[in-house]
């Protein structure tokens, strides 16, 4: 008699053949486990303590069963080498499901990452290496410093948001199958994110100082 498998992350049902988790499609299995981990918070909620922005994260009932998750991933022609993203299509989304998630490249997945814990007390894209503030953006895998030094964090943040809007629009205009498994939905979503960044810097445009652009 086959011994029942222990639920993965306390809720997941691994109904795939023995050895699937260590075979050629191990990356798919690992992503499934990661989704369950984020939805459950790990042992004693350790993950949520480390990354509180994930508190309240959920996963759809279908994806609790591994074979369903695998079927969704492999229903996309260019799924290999991509990872699941829950934030691009729906800003602020905390639910993993076919309707709210998309498979994207690691570079695109990192485009909208907000490392609040790393930046500390300052807004996105802003740090203070000395008495003045600095605006920086991760572009094409490298950190780019934007323009001059800034006297206030508001000015630096405005410069970052303007540059981010331009960069997101550049991404949206040049998407390929290598970036996402759903070009149209991803493009529409990126343009929505660009609007959000644009609104952020326009709201503080009352300053007399000019804001450096990313491409000109």
Regions found by a protein language model. Name each.
Residues 6, 11-28, 52, 60-71, ...:
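Plant transcription-factor regulatory intrinsically disordered regions
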């Amino acid at each position: 008699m086959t011994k029942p498998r222990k639920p993965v992350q306390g809720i997941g049902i691994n109904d795939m053949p023995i050895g699937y988790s260590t075979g050629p499609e191990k990356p798919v299995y690992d992503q499934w486990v990661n989704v369950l981990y984020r939805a459950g918070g790990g042992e004693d909620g350790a993950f949520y303590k480390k990354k509180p922005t994930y508190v309240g994260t959920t996963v759809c009932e279908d994806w609790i069963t591994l074979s369903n998750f695998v079927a969704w991933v492999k229903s996309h022609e260019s799924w290999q080498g991509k990872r699941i993203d829950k934030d691009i299509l729906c800003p602020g989304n905390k639910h993993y499901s076919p309707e709210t998630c998309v498979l994207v490249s690691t570079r695109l997945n990192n485009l909208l990452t907000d490392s609040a814990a790393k930046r500390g007390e300052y807004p996105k894209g802003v740090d203070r290496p000395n008495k003045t503030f600095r605006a920086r953006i991760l572009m094409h895998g490298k950190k780019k410093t934007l323009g001059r030094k800034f006297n206030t964090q508001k000015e630096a943040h405005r410069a970052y948001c303007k540059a981010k809007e331009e960069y997101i629009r550049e991404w949206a205009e040049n998407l390929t199958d290598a970036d996402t498994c759903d070009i149209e939905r991803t493009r529409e979503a990126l343009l929505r994110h660009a609007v959000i960044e644009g609104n952020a810097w326009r709201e503080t445009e009352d300053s007399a100082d000019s804001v450096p652009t990313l491409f000109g």
